[in-house]
């Protein structure tokens, strides 16, 4: 009989955020990486590439100079303290979390299709409601007209990058238990 245990730091079905920095995973510098652990201590926790880079850069208290000179070959998981060996190729050779990666690709594809169509994809199955909205947009009345959609796309294109800007975390926040607990309780980005 196999016991299934829910590990609190593993991302849930709808969760696309790193549990260390609370920033959303993406297909770039915040790609979801799965820590393999060792034969003795299996890990399997998922963190973003930026947090993994920060963990690898932290020495054993060697200071900033030690961080610049070398990266550690073993990273300790901040959730279960299991050591994970870094591959020879560096952090980018660490295995991606395939489930989260596929969800991020689907999300990016949907956003691309939505941008091409100029209209966000509707997920409701109410055919009458959709027919009314289509009729309204054909008339040109209200915020569903082509002019409003074009303005909305321009607005999103101009202000979209600004929404993703967040101030960087101080380096001492990564292991601060009190701040991490507060962040978990409030689900806020610090």
From Swiss-Prot:
User: Mind telling me which Pfam families this protein's record contains?
Assistant: DUF4632, zf-RING_UBOX
Q: Where are the zinc fingers (RING-type)?
A: 18-81
Q: Which SMART domains match?
A: RING (SM00184)
Residues passing through the membrane, by range:
none
**Does the record carry Cell inner membrane as a key word?**
no
Q: One MF term from GO for this chain?
A: zinc ion binding
Question: Which InterPro entries does the annotation name?
Answer: DUF4632, RING_finger_E3_ubiq-ligases, Znf-RING_euk, Znf_RING, Znf_RING/FYVE/PHD, Znf_RING_CS
Q: Which Gene3D superfamilies match?
A: Zinc/RING finger domain, C3HC4 (zinc finger)
Out of the domains of life, which is the source?
Eukaryota
Residue ranges, compositional bias (Acidic residues): 126-136
What are the record keywords, sorted? Answer: Metal-binding, Zinc, Zinc-finger
Q: Which GO terms describe its biological process?
A: protein ubiquitination
The region called Disordered is annotated at 111-145
- The protein in question is named RING finger protein 227
Ranked from the top, the taxonomy reads: Eukaryota, Metazoa, Chordata, Craniata, Vertebrata
């Amino acid at each position: 009989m196999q016991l299934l245990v829910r590990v609190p730091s593993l991302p849930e079905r709808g969760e696309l955020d790193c549990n260390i920095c609370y920033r959303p995973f993406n297909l770039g510098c915040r790609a979801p990486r799965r820590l393999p652990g060792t034969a003795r201590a299996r890990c399997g926790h998922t963190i973003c590439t930026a947090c993994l880079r920060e963990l690898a850069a932290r020495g054993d208290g060697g200071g900033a100079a030690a961080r610049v000179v070398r990266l550690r070959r073993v990273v300790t998981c901040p959730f279960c303290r299991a050591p994970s060996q870094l591959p020879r190729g560096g952090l980018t050779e660490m295995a991606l979390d395939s489930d989260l990666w596929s969800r991020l690709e689907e999300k990016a594809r949907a956003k691309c299709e939505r941008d091409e169509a100029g209209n966000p994809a509707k997920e409701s199955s109410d055919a009458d409601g959709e027919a009314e909205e289509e009729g309204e947009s054909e008339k040109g009345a209200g915020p569903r007209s082509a002019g409003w959609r074009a303005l909305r796309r321009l607005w999103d294109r101009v202000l979209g990058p600004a929404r993703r800007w967040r101030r960087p975390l101080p380096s001492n926040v990564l292991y601060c238990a009190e701040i991490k607990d507060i962040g978990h309780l409030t689900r806020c980005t610090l």
